[in-house]
Design a protein with these regions (language model features):
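Conserved NTP-donor binding/palm subdomain of two-metal-ion nucleotidyltransferases/polymerases, i.e.
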Residues: 3-57, 61-205
């Protein structure tokens, strides 16, 4: 693999970093590989056209194969304690429009979510009209609830807006009531809470 060769210092001196002109080009590239299952987990509203591609953009993917997507996009690690070296960070840069754009390459079995839930997320994914994959509506809602109350210390106004769009009442958009709703859904489907790698928050109360 190209990135492994680069790490080991074995790549050709003439090797050129893969670059993409747009986020749409990235999605098109990913869709060329039938062995890769991938979704954008959240914050995909407005993609790929109505977002600013710069160093502040952070795209959260879930994939079935970390090393495959890293190779396809020629991603290079944005941190030192990287998964590639047996540690835990999966944050990578991908070059888009000559800018380094951050991607989280979350993968099945990494404890970001329960593995059974991760597999369901990929196996029930939906192709968005703009050419990228997203969770089905039910899974999007509940994984966003999980992210908002378990991974994060407080609920983002962005997520409050999305919860309302899904029909949730103001009165239950709080950690206690959302946790109760999530517990019921987890119990119904046989999912469990998972402690993720240390860079991710874990606020299970």
């Amino acid at each position: 693999m190209l990135f492994r060769s680069k790490v080991l210092g074995l790549f050709d001196d003439n090797y050129t970093q893969k670059k993409f002109n747009s986020l749409q080009d990235v999605f098109h590239e990913l869709n060329k590989y039938p062995k890769l299952k991938w979704i954008i987990m959240r914050n995909f509203e407005g993609m790929p056209h109505n977002i600013t591609v710069d160093e502040h953009l952070d795209i959260d993917l879930l994939v079935n194969d970390y090393f495959l997507i890293k190779t396809i996009l020629d991603g290079f690690s944005a941190t030192n304690n990287r998964y590639d070296d047996g540690k835990n960070r999966i944050l990578n840069y991908v070059i888009i429009n000559n800018k380094k754009v951050l991607f989280d390459f979350r993968f099945v079995g990494d404890n970001y979510y329960d593995q059974k839930l991760q597999e369901k997320m990929l196996n029930s994914r939906v192709l968005h009209k703009n050419g990228f994959y997203i969770p089905n509506p039910e899974i999007h809602l509940y994984t966003l609830i999980y992210h908002a109350i378990i991974h994060k210390p407080k609920i983002s106004p962005t997520y409050v807006k999305i919860f309302k769009e899904y029909g949730l009442e103001d009165s239950i958009i709080n950690k206690k009531d959302l946790k109760s709703k999530l517990n019921d859904w987890f119990q119904k489907n046989g999912y469990s809470y998972c402690r993720p790698e240390p860079s991710v928050g874990y606020h299970l109360h």
